[in-house]
Amino acid sequence: SRPDIIYGETALVDLNRNFIGMRRLKAPEQLSRKSFRMGMLVCHQAFIAKRSIAPNYDLAYRFSSDFDWCIKCMRSAQTLFNTHQILINYLNEGATTKNRKASLQERYNIMVKYYGKTTVKILHIWFAIRFLFAKIFKKNA
């Protein structure tokens, strides 16, 4: 049978559609409904769900309805398939990038909704530590 969701990689492009590089977050080999605890590991444009499991976007979220939608789809899916292919060329600057703080707050709230406040707080402490180490090592490199 066909998978409920197929997903793949994302290439970043500039306004002239010139290749910049690959998205920092790589699509995991095995994607599951718990995967997005670590952030949006797959761009929604590189995430294709069967219509039968795909709900409407929750328009209460201005910047992160895609994040909520992907989690809802994964919660309904039985099979997810990694294509190991670049599925989209993604414009590096978009509405979410321009509204980063509001987008991050929405994503945090969505994560709490699906994964629980304690889990999300612990994960965000880990994200902060990882970010600081990356910054320190980048300076020293």
What are these regions (language model features)?
Residues 1-5:
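Conserved donor-nucleotide/metal-binding helix-loop-beta segment in metal-dependent transferases, i.e.
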Residues 112-141:
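Membrane-proximal basic amphipathic "stem/tether" segments
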Residues 14-18, 92, 129-135:
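Short, solvent-exposed polar/charged micro-motifs at secondary-structure junctions
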Residues 8, 14, 21-102, 106:
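Conserved nucleotide-sugar donor-binding catalytic segment
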